[in-house]
């Protein structure tokens, strides 16, 4: 049980995150594919090897290999898009009409249904701090019939997985001293 491994590795000051990640993995707000893909996409977005490997191990019990690839693909394409769209926003109106010019074919054919991939893209955009992408994907989800509560559940996954990764990274540095 890899989530259990993460929970066991968390220090006392991260008890809230231990409880939060346990609760999220039992959530019924999202279906199994949405939930476990959100966990995988969030773990990839944290760039923390331990968090990604532990979550991937357990996620494979809940996801097809195609869904795992789609979740990892979401994290990858959103890493690029979040940087580019944040930069366009910061650069102002002079850059608004500049051609984006980057490939993102996975968005059109992700290997899972559109709403699921959009949810995972929302999760990653929350971690990466891209307001433009977060809003755009959340609006698409609403248009696809996904509820605000389901979107928020994805955001909760993003926040908790990021917090778990941060605590484990802090402890890795601390133990290396």
Swiss-Prot record:
Annotated catalysed reactions: N(6)-[(R)-dihydrolipoyl]-L-lysyl-[lipoyl-carrier protein] + a hydroperoxide = N(6)-[(R)-lipoyl]-L-lysyl-[lipoyl-carrier protein] + an alcohol + H2O
Enzyme class: oxidoreductase
A Pfam family per the record: CMD
E.C. number(s) listed in UniProt: 1.11.1.28
SUPFAM superfamilies: AhpD-like
Family membership: Belongs to the AhpD family.
UniProt protein name: Alkyl hydroperoxide reductase AhpD
């Amino acid at each position: 049980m890899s989530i259990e491994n993460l929970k066991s590795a968390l220090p006392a000051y991260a008890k809230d995150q231990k409880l939060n990640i346990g609760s999220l993995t039992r959530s019924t707000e999202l279906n199994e594919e949405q939930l476990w893909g959100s966990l995988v996409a969030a773990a990839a977005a944290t760039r923390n090897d331990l968090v990604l490997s532990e979550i991937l191990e357990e996620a494979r019990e809940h996801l097809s290999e195609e869904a795992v690839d789609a979740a990892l693909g979401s994290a990858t394409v959103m890493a690029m898009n979040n940087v580019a769209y944040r930069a366009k926003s910061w650069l102002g109106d002079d850059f608004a009409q500049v051609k984006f010019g980057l490939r993102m074919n996975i968005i059109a054919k992700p290997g899972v249904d559109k709403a699921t991939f959009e949810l995972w893209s929302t999760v990653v955009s929350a971690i990466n701090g891209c307001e433009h992408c977060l809003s755009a994907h959340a609006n698409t989800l609403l248009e696809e019939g996904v509820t605000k509560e389901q979107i928020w559940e994805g955001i909760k996954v993003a926040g908790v997985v990021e917090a778990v990764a941060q605590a484990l990274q802090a402890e890795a540095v601390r133990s290396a001293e």
